[in-house]
């Protein structure tokens, strides 16, 4: 699965521990922030940053999150 910044995904397990709640999120590049967290996850229903990861690979390999669909 090839994800990039700007990818829109349907995921479960990100905001709550429940795998019943599906969230639509976008991966946002935060490299200019200067922190070690370059990958921000934006919840598209609330337009809030809901998670920080060091990289897209870190997001993909997170055991709690399941990617259901890559929309764009």
Label each residue range with its predicted role:
Residues 5-8, 22-25, 36:
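Short, surface-exposed beta-edge/turn micro-motifs
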Residues 38-72:
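Intrinsically disordered, low-complexity, charged/polar segments
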Residues 17-19, 35, 45-47:
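Intrinsic-disorder/low-complexity loop/linker signature
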Residues 4, 12, 28-29, 42, ...:
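A structural detector for beta-sheet-dominated domains
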Residues 1-15, 19:
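Short coil-to-beta transition motif at edge beta-strands of beta-rich domains
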Residues 18-32:
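Short beta-strand-centered aromatic/proline hotspots
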